[in-house]
Amino acid sequence: MNLFSSLTLVTLILLTMPIAAINFNTHKFTNYPLYVKTTISCAFITSMIPTMMFIHTGQEMIISNWHWLTIQTLKLSLSFKMDFFSMMFVPVALFVTWSIMEFSMWYMHSDPNINQFFKYLLLFLITMLILVTANNLFQLFIGWEGVGIMSFLLIGWWYGRTDANTAALQAILYNRIGDIGFILAMAWFLINLNTWDLQQIFMLNPNDSNLPLMGLILAATGKSAQFGLHPWLPSAMEGPTPVSALLHSSTMVVAGIFLLIRFYPLTENNKFGQSIMLCLGAMTTLFTAMCALTQNDIKKIIAFSTSSQLGLMMVTIGINQPHLAFLHICTHAFFKAMLFMCSGSIIHSLNDEQDIRKMGGLFKAMPFTTTALIIGSLALTGMPFLTGFYSKDLIIESANTSYTNAWALLMTLVATSFTAIYSTRIIFFALLGQPRFPTLININENNPFLINSIKRLLIGSLFAGFIISNNIPPMTIPQMTMPHYLKMTALTVTILGFILALEISNTTHYLKFNYPSNTFKFSNLLGYYPTIMHRLTPYMNLTMSQKSASSLLDLIWLETILPKTISLAQMKMSTTITSQKGLIKLYFLSFLITILISTTLLNFHE
C-alpha cells in the first residue's frame, strides 16, 4: 500500500515539474509544449499503476501528509482521497489531456504565446486533479476555484476579440452564482458539524441536510451548466478548440456533477434533493438538445450536446445512481473530446470556418477526420458496443425501471432521440453532399500530432467503455431483468431519431419555407433565454433606475431642495425677526381707532 500512495503522489508531483522548469529558466523554451506533453504521458502511465492496484485490491486510501491549521476544534490538513471516483477519473483525465496537448501542438503552432497556453492548460489539469482527489471541502474549493479561473483565462485567450472577452466574463459570472451555493454549504457544515472532512460529514450524516444540499445543487448548476445557468457553456466556444475539448467537454464542466457524486451519501436518502436534481436534469437535457437542433456553428452544436449529456448525468443522480453517472462521465470524456478535436481539424483546414452550411463533401478530402467524427457521433448516440453504449444504455434502462416522475423520464427519452438528430445533422452538412467552401482552400490532415491524438481518443471511443465497465468494482453485479421492449427502448429511441433527422433534412431541402416557423426561432435563439436575461432584464433595470433617478432628481433637488427650502427658510426668518403677525383686521381696526381718536381730539381742540 506504500507503493500505492507513493505512486499516486508521484503522478501529481510530475505535473508540477514543467511549471517549475519554466520559472527557473530565463530564456524561452523552444520545445516547451513537447516537454509538457511528454510529462503528461509519463504521469498517465504512472497513474495507471495505482489504478490497477486499486482495481485488484479494491482498497480505498486517504493520504494525509501535512497538517495545515487548527481553528479551535476544526483541524485542516492536506489530504487526498484515493477512492473509486478519484482512481478512475485521474487516468481518464490524464489520457484525454495528453491527446489534447498533442493536438494543441498542431492547432496552436502559429501562436506566439504557445508556451503560456500550455502552462495554462497544465495549471488547469493540476487544479482539476486537486478537485478530484480532495478529501476536505476547503481543498476541493481550491480546485473548484482553480478550474474556474483557468477557464476564464483560456476562454479569453484571444483577448483582441470582443466576443471572447464577453464569453470569459459571462463564464466567470455564472460560475460565481454557483460558488455562492458552494460557500453556503461549506458554512453550514462548519456551523452545524464543525468539520470539512468528507468522511466525517458522511459519518455524522445530518438529517436536515436540505439547505447544504441546495447549496451543492446550485454549485453544480453553475459549474455544469444546468438549466438557468446554462448560457455560458455555448458562449465558451469563443476560446480555442483545444480549450473547448479539454475544459468544456470532458473535465471542468463535469466538476459540478462530480461534486454531487462525491456527496452521494447525503443525497441517497434525501427524496427532496433527488426530485430537484431529476427535474433540473430533465429540463436541461431536453432544452439544450432542442437548441442544438437548429444551430449552424459546428462547435456550438457540440457544446449544446455536452450540456445535454450533463443534464442526463444529473438525471442519473436524481434516480439515485451516482456510480452510473460517474461511469458516463468517464466514457463521455473520450468521444466528446474527440468530436471537438475533429471539429477543430475541420475548422483549421477550412481557414477558421465554423458554419456547417459552408462545409460539405469533406468525406473524400479528410477521410481520417470523417471516420473519427462518425464513430464519435455513433458513440454519443449510444450505438451498441461503442463506448457511449455502456453507460447511456444503462442510464435509460435504470430510468425506465425506476419508480420515478413520468414527465422527467419522457423528457429524457425525447432528448436522447434528439441526440441522434443533431449528430446526423453535423455528418450530413459537414461531410456529405457537394463542397460548399472556396476551392482555393488547402486541406491537409496529415500532421502526426493531429493523427496520433485523434487516433488515441478513437481507440478510447471504441474500447474504453468495455474496459472501464468490466474493471470497476463491484465486479459481480446482479443482472437486471426486464421485458424485451424495455431493453430495446434506448436503441429504438435513437433509431427513431435517425429516421426523423433524415426526414427533417429532406423536408428542409425540398420544401422551402418563406418564413422560419416559431419553433425554429425558439430553438435557434436558444429559447429566447439569453435575449431576456442578457438584454431585456438589464435594459429594464437600467431604464427603471434612470427613470426613478430622474424623477427623484426633479422631485427632490429641483423642487424640494432649492425653491421650497429657500421660501421656507425665508418665511421662518421673517417670522422670527419681525414682530408682525399678519393680523390685518386688527391692524386696520387699531389704525381706524387711532384716526377716529385723533380727529375727535382735533375737532374738540378747535
UniProtKB/Swiss-Prot annotation:
GO terms for biological process: electron transport coupled proton transport; mitochondrial electron transport, NADH to ubiquinone; mitochondrial respiratory chain complex I assembly. Belongs to the complex I subunit 5 family. This is NADH-ubiquinone oxidoreductase chain 5. The keyword Glycoprotein does not apply. It comes from Ovis aries (Sheep). It is found in: Mitochondrion inner membrane. One of its GO terms (molecular function) is NADH dehydrogenase (ubiquinone) activity. Its EC number is 7.1.1.2. Core subunit of the mitochondrial membrane respiratory chain NADH dehydrogenase (Complex I) which catalyzes electron transfer from NADH through the respiratory chain, using ubiquinone as an electron acceptor. Essential for the catalytic activity and assembly of complex I. One of its GO terms (cellular component) is mitochondrial inner membrane. It is an enzyme of class 7 (translocase). Keywords: Electron transport, Membrane, Mitochondrion, Mitochondrion inner membrane, NAD, Respiratory chain, Translocase, Transmembrane, Transmembrane helix, Transport, Ubiquinone. Core subunit of respiratory chain NADH dehydrogenase (Complex I) which is composed of 45 different subunits. It catalyses: a ubiquinone + NADH + 5 H(+)(in) = a ubiquinol + NAD(+) + 4 H(+)(out). It holds the Pfam family Proton_antipo_M. The chain crosses the membrane at residues 4-24, 43-63, 84-104, 114-134, 140-160, 171-191, 213-233, 241-261, 272-292, 301-320, 325-347, 366-386, 413-433, 457-477, 485-505, 582-602.
